[in-house]
């Protein structure tokens, strides 16, 4: 859905019909700004005072300048609206935290990955053998669904869909009282 929304945004951005609509609106605005209501006293003063006549060319230049200023302000406000809509349209990423207690909980975790949600998995409530099986199942599913599984703690893993980038620093996990028993290497015991 995110790809479809992005494509629709790109198409709507380059759509020529919308651009002409905005230009028509911009051309109408200076006309509204230039009109002023005159009170009866102002109307009476006009015949008494000689008006300064501005050559038609200067009037045309002034209207062009005003139109250009309106178009610039419109384009600035449009770019601000586009930036704001891009920020609002960006989907918020939800991270689900799961503490699986049995092997069957792995299916629920994979379903979250299918729905493009990030999952933080903590195996602290599982026995080592069950945790290995569960981790193996989740790792296989993440490969099929083009997800990413990263170890973030001694018993914690972060499962993310393909569109989420995780920038994690390499930290030395303490191997003092807990040996890294939950690892991809299934042969080590």
UniProtKB/Swiss-Prot annotation:
Coiled coil (UniProt feature): none
Keywords of the record: Cell cycle, Cell division, Cytoplasm, Septation
Single GO BP term: division septum assembly
Chief location category: cytoplasm
Recorded GO CC terms: cytoplasm
InterPro entries linked to this entry: Cell_div_SepF, Cell_div_SepF/SepF-rel, SepF-like_sf
Spans annotated as Disordered: 18-64
Subcellular location: Cytoplasm
Cited Pfam families: SepF
Basic and acidic residues biased stretches: 22-35
Homology family: Belongs to the SepF family.
Oligomeric and partner information: Homodimer. Interacts with FtsZ.
Biological function: Cell division protein that is part of the divisome complex and is recruited early to the Z-ring. Probably stimulates Z-ring formation, perhaps through the cross-linking of FtsZ protofilaments. Its function overlaps with FtsA.
UniProt name for this protein: Cell division protein SepF
Source organism: Streptococcus thermophilus (strain ATCC BAA-250 / LMG 18311)
């Amino acid at each position: 859905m995110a790809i479809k929304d992005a494509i629709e945004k790109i198409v709507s951005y380059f759509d020529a019909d919308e651009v002409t609509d905005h230009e028509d609106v911009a051309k109408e605005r200076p006309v509204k700004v230039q009109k002023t209501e005159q009170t009866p006293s102002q109307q009476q003063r006009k015949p008494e005072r000689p008006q300064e006549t501005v050559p038609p060319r200067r009037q045309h230049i002034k209207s062009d300048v005003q139109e250009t200023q309106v178009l610039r302000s419109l384009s600035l406000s449009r770019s601000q609206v586009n930036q704001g809509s891009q920020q609002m349209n960006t989907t918020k990423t939800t991270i689900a935290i799961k503490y699986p207690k049995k092997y069957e909980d792995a299916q629920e975790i994979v379903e979250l990955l299918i729905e493009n949600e990030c999952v933080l998995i903590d195996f602290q409530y599982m026995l080592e053998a069950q945790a290995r099986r569960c981790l193996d199942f989740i790792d296989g599913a993440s490969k099929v669904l083009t997800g990413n599984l990263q170890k973030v703690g001694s018993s914690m893993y972060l499962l993310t869909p393909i569109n989420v980038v995780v920038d994690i620093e390499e930290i030395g996990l303490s191997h003092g009282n807990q040996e890294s028993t939950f690892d991809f290497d299934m042969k080590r015991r």
